Each structure stands twice: as C-alpha cells, then as structure tokens.
C-alpha cells in the first residue's frame, strides 16, 4: 500500500499548491503530469493521484461546505492551509472512494498532518474526519 500512500501525499501536494497559488487543482495536476513527462527527475503522476484530485475537483463545493459546517470554531479561511487541504482530500476519500476503508483514510490524513503541519493538527484532522465518518451514512443519503 506504499503506492497509495505516495499517491495520497502527491494529491495533497497538488491541492496545497493550487490553494497557495489560487489556481484550479486540475491546472496544477496537468502541470505535474507535463513536468513528469519532460523532466526525468519528476516521478510520474499515478492513476490514484489523478483519481483523487479529479474527484475532489468535482466535489469541491460540497467538501468545503461540510468542512465549514463541522469544523467547530474554525472557518476555512482561518484554518491553516495545510490542514484545510488534508481535510479536503480526506473528506473526498472518506465519502466518495468506497474501496478505501474509513480507518485507512483517517490514519493517512493524520499521518499527513504529522508530517506537514503543527503539533495540534493531527488531533484536529482526526476529530473532524472522525465526525464526518460518523455522519457518513446520512451525508451519503443527502447526496443521492
């Protein structure tokens, strides 16, 4: 599963870059793919990375709405950019990628927070995604 871990990390980096630059994530994804084809130092972008980024792009408004609704005391704008994008990726994978077990989604998101964010971030990410996991059946019914 190391390949999936790497794919998630790269998807997070693409979301983060898009957020930081104020550019659509699909544009950033296309840039990454182009660079990986022209620069041998850049590893190729995996199918799973593409699936995560493209899936997120289709659900971005709903994902941001859910994060805003359940992140008690935080607005998206006030949230650290790293945490915001870990939560975006985790929310997409948790609610719309059925082949990934929920526990794996939460664990991977917490690991990203440990690697890229503050000491308080892993607990914040785990708490919010844990809440969405509890609500997953009703949230999915709303989507149908």
UniProtKB/Swiss-Prot annotation:
Record's keyword terms, sorted: RNA-binding, Transcription, Transcription antitermination, Transcription regulation
One Pfam assignment: NusB
Gene Ontology BP annotations: DNA-templated transcription termination; transcription antitermination
One cellular component term from this protein's GO annotations in UniProt: cytosol
Molecular-function annotations in GO: RNA binding
UniProt xrefs under InterPro entries: NusB-like_sf (IPR035926), NusB_fam (IPR011605), NusB_RsmB_TIM44 (IPR006027)
Function according to Swiss-Prot or TrEMBL: Involved in transcription antitermination. Required for transcription of ribosomal RNA (rRNA) genes. Binds specifically to the boxA antiterminator sequence of the ribosomal RNA (rrn) operons.
Family under the similarity heading: Belongs to the NusB family.
Record protein name field: Transcription antitermination protein NusB
Gene name as annotated: nusB
């Amino acid at each position: 599963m190391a390949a999936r871990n790497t794919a998630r990390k790269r998807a997070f980096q693409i979301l983060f870059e898009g957020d930081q630059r104020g550019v659509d994530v699909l544009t950033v994804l296309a840039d990454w793919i182009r660079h990986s084809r022209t620069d041998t130092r850049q590893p190729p972008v995996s199918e799973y990375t593409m699936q995560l980024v493209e899936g997120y792009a289709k659900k971005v408004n709903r994902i941001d709405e859910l994060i805003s609704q359940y992140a008690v005391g935080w607005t998206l704008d006030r949230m650290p950019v790293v945490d915001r994008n870990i939560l975006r990726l985790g929310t997409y994978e948790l609610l719309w990628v059925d082949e990934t077990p929920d526990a794996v989604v939460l664990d991977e998101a917490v690991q990203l927070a440990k690697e890229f964010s503050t000491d308080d971030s892993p607990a914040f990410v785990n708490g919010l995604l844990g809440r969405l996991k509890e609500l997953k059946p009703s949230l999915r019914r709303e989507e149908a």
